[in-house]
Design a protein with these regions (language model features):
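Short intrinsically disordered terminal tails
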Residues: 1-3, 90-94
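Low-complexity, intrinsically disordered/propeptide-like segments
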Residues: 10-13, 83, 87
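Intrinsically disordered, low-complexity regulatory segments enriched in Ser/Thr/Pro
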Residues: 41-86
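Negatively charged, low-complexity tracts enriched in Asp/Glu with abundant Ser/Thr
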Residues: 1-40
């Protein structure tokens, strides 16, 4: 699965270059595309540029997974800890 197949209405021009080490874990039942860093469990949510799906959040949200399965890797259920959020992509990648 990729964000392009799971969110076909997400404008490709609005998707920033995701940093190395992040894998696309987007799933259509989530509010927007997401990427996970398997080594650290950091999750990066990238919301639509207009009319965002993430309520009460900035366009770019960084969270950390707290539940890791030996079979399936990091799991979103079991809790996500908010790390940082911003509407400025440069602040996320700094």
């Amino acid at each position: 699965m990729t964000y392009a197949t799971e969110f076909p209405d997400f404008p490709a021009a609005a998707m920033p270059a995701v940093p190395d080490g992040f894998a696309d874990r987007s799933w259509r039942n989530e509010p927007c595309p997401c990427f996970i860093h398997e080594a650290s469990g950091i999750v990066l949510w990238i919301d639509y540029p207009a009319n965002g799906e993430l309520r009460d959040c900035a366009r770019f949200v960084v969270q950390r997974c707290t539940n890791r399965s030996a079979e399936a890797g990091w799991q979103f259920d079991g809790g996500l800890i908010d790390v940082f959020q911003s509407d400025d992509w440069r602040a996320i990648t700094a």
